[in-house]
Design a protein with these regions (language model features):
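Sec-dependent N-terminal signal peptides
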Residues: 4-12
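Sec/Tat signal peptide C-region and signal peptidase I cleavage site
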Residues: 14-18
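GH16 jelly-roll
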Residues: 19-290
Length: 290
């Protein structure tokens, strides 16, 4: 009886979330944003987040501009952030963006760009799927998920140097300070990646995306020249780490003082400049599972 009650509760909860899952593409061509709200909790500086701004490298492209405020404290959500007005669920997510190049001005800056879903439900726990970049090394991409209850979170993740094609790690861990347990078999596909010789997330726009299913998550990007989809991680073969309840679709940019990129352990400095993230568009298309 308890199991039946829980399954019924889960179905009702999922239905309530899923009814808001409608496809959209936010182009950021106007000052007003249709599908997202401001989610920042830091300073209220007007320059931090602006839509309809001209790109610094593509004059014909209007963008969402996120700029770090040097007065913001460390922590996710302190810097600029947008959060979808409605819940999103299983389906295909993609975005075209360019992260800042901080290497000349402040090579040891501690700053994170996050492209992700996130919702912490008091009963079902955390539902997060993410892409992350640390400004100190724009050749490296972090992808993964967070699931579970507060204090008992679980992470599955892969770290990639796309310029060299090296997979630095593919692993599971408990909580933020847990030990990495490497994956093998179907959870570790593809085992090898082809390098993109001139990959630099701060040099140009790239299109990134992930496909979220109940039994599988695939992270990918489009090759900047051929447009071919390059699969970064096709995680399947286990239900561990796959969020099952709906979430909120997000983009953020923030100072991290306790997470340094693998290639530069000193990259924890508070930002000294108003580094700018440029987002061309964000899209979401629900799947038939939803």
């Amino acid at each position: 009886m308890k199991q039946l009650f829980f399954l019924n509760f889960l179905f009702v909860t999922q239905s309530a979330y899923s009814q808001n899952s409608v496809a959209f593409k936010e182009e950021f061509t106007q000052p007003g944003i249709e599908n997202f709200i401001n989610g920042a909790t830091g300073t209220k500086a007007v320059f931090k987040s602006n839509s309809g701004v001209q790109s610094s490298i593509e004059k014909e492209t209007s963008i969402l501009s996120f700029k770090l405020d040097t007065n913001d404290a460390a922590g996710a959500g302190r810097g600029p952030e947008i959060i979808s007005k409605n819940f999103t669920h299983f389906g295909s997510y993609s975005a075209r963006l360019k992260i800042p190049d901080a290497r000349e001005l402040q090579p040891n800056v501690g700053a994170v760009v996050g492209y992700f879903t996130y919702h912490a439900d008091k009963d079902l726990g955390l539902s997060e799927i993410d892409f992350e970049w640390l400004l100190a090394d724009p050749n490296i991409i972090y992808v993964g998920t967070w699931t579970g209850q507060k204090g008992k979170l679980e992470r599955i993740g892969r770290t990639i140097n796309l310029k060299t094609g090296e997979i630095l790690s593919t692993a599971f861990r408990s909580n933020h300070d847990g030990v990495n347990h490497p994956f093998s078999g179907r959870q570790n596909k593809p085992k090898k990646l082809s390098k993109i010789e001139d990959y630099d997330a701060s040099a140009r726009f790239y299109t990134y995306g992930f496909d979220w299913h109940s039994d599988r998550i695939t992270w990918w990007l489009l090759h900047p020249k051929s447009g071919r989809k390059i699969v970064l991680w096709d995680y399947k073969g286990s239900s561990m780490g796959i969020p099952l309840h709906a979430s909120k679709y997000r983009m953020n940019f923030w100072h991290a003082n306790n997470w340094a990129v693998e290639t530069n352990p000193r990259s924890l400095e508070k930002p000294k400049y108003n580094f700018e993230l440029e987002v061309d568009w964000m899209s979401y298309k629900p799947s038939k599972e939803d």
